[in-house]
């Protein structure tokens, strides 16, 4: 299976109202805004979408809403992975019925499976669906690192077609590209690593910063792919302060605050995350002004 998700996918936040319930009208508005401002696709209910705090029913509501709003205009990738293989299969199959274009499966967190356990988990979920699958490796959150050799085994499964690589290790990214077939796409899971990953054969990024600067990220990637490395590096440097600022505390706390400042009231995060402090908000305002967004 050969699939092109595009270059810039936004890891979309999950909007909440004042009662901390899903704000589906805002989810529609945000999805439209992201696609209109440069996103090729949206990843719904991933880390940035606070997936662990959402019930299965809430996740399905978000999948349904985003597909209805931007399906056909952008790729909709449903975050259906968890530490339970059985639950991941059930959510994946339910998401498929709603018309999502693909699923993203995070490495099982907390229970720390072996490399063979990771392989068996991803294979079982992939074999339960006809959808293309993107694997999500983020050892800083899951405490387990999917090794390139394991990913290469998984790439032999027909519908496992991409990885969101957020190890932050360029040696690992290089080894992934060396071992994986050309049609298997590698996406950066860290905005600050997008340009370095492109340099070793990456496809694009699953981005937090694209909530705010999706067009600029597209411009940077286009500059790189057209051979204008100097311009790509200049754009990377200009985006870097804002990108780092969006991780001054746990994601998605800063990006939710920033969206609110720009008139997209997506609400605060659910507990156990808490909203940005006044000091953090002031730092964000400065960064948004410097980026000419405020």
Swiss-Prot record:
UniProt keyword list: Amino-acid biosynthesis, Cytoplasm, Diaminopimelate biosynthesis, Lyase, Lysine biosynthesis, Schiff base
Q: What is its EC number?
A: 4.3.3.7
Q: Where is the active site?
A: 136, 164
Q: What class of enzyme is it?
A: lyase
Q: Which residues bind pyruvate?
A: 48, 206
- Supply one GO molecular-function term: 4-hydroxy-tetrahydrodipicolinate synthase activity
Show which residues constitute the signal peptide. none
Task: Kindly list the residues the record flags as site (Part of a proton relay during catalysis).
Answer: 47, 110
The organism's superkingdom is given as Bacteria
Pathway in which the depicted protein is active: Amino-acid biosynthesis; L-lysine biosynthesis via DAP pathway; (S)-tetrahydrodipicolinate from L-aspartate: step 3/4
Instruction: Output one GO BP term.
Output: lysine biosynthetic process via diaminopimelate
Is the keyword Amino-acid biosynthesis assigned to this protein?
yes
What SUPFAM superfamilies does this protein map onto? Aldolase (SSF51569)
Report if keyword Amino-acid biosynthesis is assigned: yes
Q: Which cellular component, as a GO term, is one annotated location? A: cytosol
Q: Which reaction does it catalyse?
A: L-aspartate 4-semialdehyde + pyruvate = (2S,4S)-4-hydroxy-2,3,4,5-tetrahydrodipicolinate + H2O + H(+)
- Major localization class: cytoplasm
Where in the cell? Answer: Cytoplasm
Q: Explain the purpose of this protein.
A: Catalyzes the condensation of (S)-aspartate-beta-semialdehyde [(S)-ASA] and pyruvate to 4-hydroxy-tetrahydrodipicolinate (HTPA).
State how it assembles: Homotetramer; dimer of dimers.
Q: Which family does it belong to?
A: Belongs to the DapA family.
Q: Which HAMAP family match?
A: DapA (MF_00418)
Protein name according to UniProt: 4-hydroxy-tetrahydrodipicolinate synthase
